Each structure stands twice: as structure tokens, then as C-alpha cells.
């Protein structure tokens, strides 16, 4: 993707004038350097502006190992551990599938609550295979609730297939998130 906060010419990128079928966007990144914190900062800004936010944000204490990573329910504040603490010799996936299943209730509640925005910590390997929070993400977007997530370049092709190229791809910046969200709200106000 270009460094411009708008887009490349591919449909579904921020800055396109075409109407999107789904009110869904992903912050696209090459590495995790601060992307979770950017999403959390954006969510905090919207919440302080009086908007209702649901979903999950990923949080990890500075200088902590990845087993300290939590999914934080943006409505209730409940925290779910994202990773299992496996032995150093283990070759199993350390993502805690049971914890993700428990955390998915935050996404399902969003469909009932109809918040201004729902966030999903990321579209990653599990979602690329149809697992993780994939079903919940589609249900939120299909209900017409704006959904924002994070996707690595590694899963960008799967993300595009998942959204049918109807999702918006954002640069990892607060400005890009605000522009996307403001555009959605403006289109909603006109309809």
C-alpha cells in the first residue's frame, strides 16, 4: 500500500468514492509496531466523544511476554487471555481458542446493542481459515454496524476474499481511521 493515507486504486480502499457493501475496514500493517495501541487510542477518542463502542481490543503490557496479551471487551471491560502459557518445547499453537470463544460474546452482544462502532482485535490466521472471530465479524458487518479490525500484510489476500473486496483498507494512522469513520457517519446521515 502507498504511504498516502487515502488509497491505491484497488476497490475497497479508503478514499474510493464507490459505495461499499459492508461498513467494514481493516488497518493494514507490515508488522505489529504499535497498531494495537493505535486502535485503542482511536477507540478511546470515540468513547470520550460520547460514542458507543463494542468489541475487542488487544492489549499487552510494555516489556511483557506475549502470554500477558489480553483481549479487552470494550463494553464490559472484561479481559480474556489471548495466549496459553505452553512449555518452551511445545510446538502447538499457543493461541487460547477457548478464551477466544469466550471473548466472542463481546462481538455477539454488539449485534444486539447496535453500537456506533464495533472493533475486532484482528483478522489473523484463525479468521483467514474461517475460525476465530470470523463469523462474529461478518454478523456485525451484515447487521450494518461499522466494524474496524487490524490485518497483517500476511493475511491481506484472505481479508480481501473474506470481505469480497468490499472492505476498506486503512493505513495505520489515527487520521485514516477518523476519515473512514466520519465518511461512514456522513453516508449514514444522508440515507
Locations of the language-model features?
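Glycine-rich, charge-decorated loop segments at or immediately adjacent to ligand/cofactor-binding or catalytic sites
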Residues: 153-167
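Helix-adjacent hinge/juxtasegments
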Residues: 74-113
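Short, solvent-exposed loop/turn segments at secondary-structure junctions
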Residues: 34, 126-129
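Short Gly/Thr/Asp-enriched flexible loops that form oxyanion-binding sites at enzyme active sites
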Residues: 128-138
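A charged, well-structured terminal subsegment
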Residues: 171-191
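Substrate-engagement module of ASCE P-loop NTPases
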Residues: 137-153
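N-terminal phosphate/diphosphate-binding loop that engages ATP/GTP or pyrophosphate donors
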Residues: 36, 40-87
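Glycine-rich P-loop/Walker A and Walker A-like loops and their local beta1-loop-alpha1 context
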Residues: 2-4, 8-53
